[in-house]
Amino acid sequence: MEKMHITNQEHDAFVKSHPNGDLLQLTKWAETKKLTGWYARRIAVGRDGEVQGVAQLLFKKVPKLPYTLCYISRGFVVDYSNKEALNALLDSAKEIAKAEKTYAIKIDPDVEVDKGTDALQNLKALGFKHKGFKEGLSKDYIQPRMTMITPIDKNDDELLNSFERRNRSKVRLALKRGTTVERSDREGLKTFAELMKITGERDGFLTRDISYFENIYDALHEDGDAELFLVKLDPKENIAKVNQELNELHAEIAKWQQKMKTSEKQAKKAQNMINDAQNKIAKNEDLKRDLEALEKEHPEGIYLSGALLMFAGSKSYYLYGASSNEFRDFLPNHHMQYTMMKYAREHGATTYDFGGTDNDPDKDSEHYGLWAFKKVWGTYLSEKIGEFDYVLNQPLYQLIEQVKPRLTKAKIKISRKLKRK
């Protein structure tokens, strides 16, 4: 086994074709990390000119100290049963890490627990310290240890039928409601950033500046690994649909009124059907007024939701999503998710990753809503083997990874107590 010098294109081709490859190991992903102070180095090992393992090493300086952290996000990309290749990757990583004055090498492979026996054993044998099997969204991990994944290597009907029953109904309803899903361009990021700001204010989280999303799009779109989708509501088109539905409902009422006159047996059923139709008419009249007001203010329509869809070979990722507070009954997110899954499948993906979650959290958990949303899309829980540290400077590692977090927690507790007084 020997070190190899390969191009960025060869690195990415290996990552995209390997079962343990991941979006975060693509060379263009490293470009997106520069804004936050990370810089990258890459290594590859193989035999007789054939690549057998690669890794993208991200480095970040420790504040006020002449040291760095090395983070190999979702790496190494290698067959973890191949001890020789794994050892060669670690040797190459250590060589670069020492030159960068790194106190620890941190990895979190894209290897699931039920397939990770070799990885666990061989990494520990090499001296890696396992961070344990904590909840998926534990703050002790950089990346979520658990994600929710939908298999999408099936036809449209099979895909739809893989969703939970109630969610299937919502998707079908969303398809009828009259929104349009667009694959947008870079200009659409302005709209997406505005929707993200609305989402953050509604759900209580800090949002990224538009430059963050532009950075991701610019780095990965050219290779087809980043796409922006937006969902639009056209008022004129939907007013016509509402008018058609109102005509149908009035015709239905007339039909049941006629039956009431000719058949006493059907009178009760007819009255129930009439009442139901009248309720629908009232709702449609309200919707029509809202759409007419929208047409006056925005005759070209408005965008209701958006998302960034990412790729790494046969894997696709729902990376960021945002939505408006308006016309939520149109279920734009359901239309968008189903459309993005089909797009991902048509472009070579077999899986659609919804991102991090905990495993079946309690209803009072802050993560319950996230899990509840992701579980209805025909997903399975992808539980990774977790995070590992290879320590190069034990005193500094002890200070940064263990002592400092405890001091931070202590400060927070003291601050809370003082606020209560």
Swiss-Prot record:
Disulfide bridge map: none
Localization (cell): Cytoplasm
Pfam families the UniProt entry points to: FemAB
Class of this enzyme: transferase
Superkingdom of this protein's organism: Bacteria
A cellular component annotation (GO) from this entry: cytoplasm
Main location: cytoplasm
Residue ranges of coiled coil: none
Key words of the record: Acyltransferase, Antibiotic resistance, Cell shape, Cell wall biogenesis/degradation, Cytoplasm, Peptidoglycan synthesis, Transferase
Enzyme Commission number: 2.3.2.16
GO molecular function: aminoacyltransferase activity
GO biological process annotation, one example: regulation of cell shape
Keyword Cell wall biogenesis/degradation: yes
Gene3D superfamilies from the UniProt entry: 1.20.58.90, 3.40.630.30
Family under the similarity heading: Belongs to the FemABX family.
Function (record text): Catalyzes the incorporation of the first glycine of the pentaglycine interpeptide bridge, which is characteristic of the S.aureus peptidoglycan. This glycine is added to the epsilon-amino group of the L-lysine of the membrane-bound lipid II intermediate (GlcNAc-(beta-1,4)-N-acetylmuramic acid(-L-Ala-D-iGln-L-Lys-D-Ala-D-Ala)-pyrophosphoryl-undecaprenol), using glycyl-tRNA(Gly) as donor, in a ribosome-independent mechanism. Involved in methicillin resistance.
Subunit structure: Monomer.
Record-given protein name: Lipid II:glycine glycyltransferase
Species of origin: Staphylococcus aureus (strain COL)
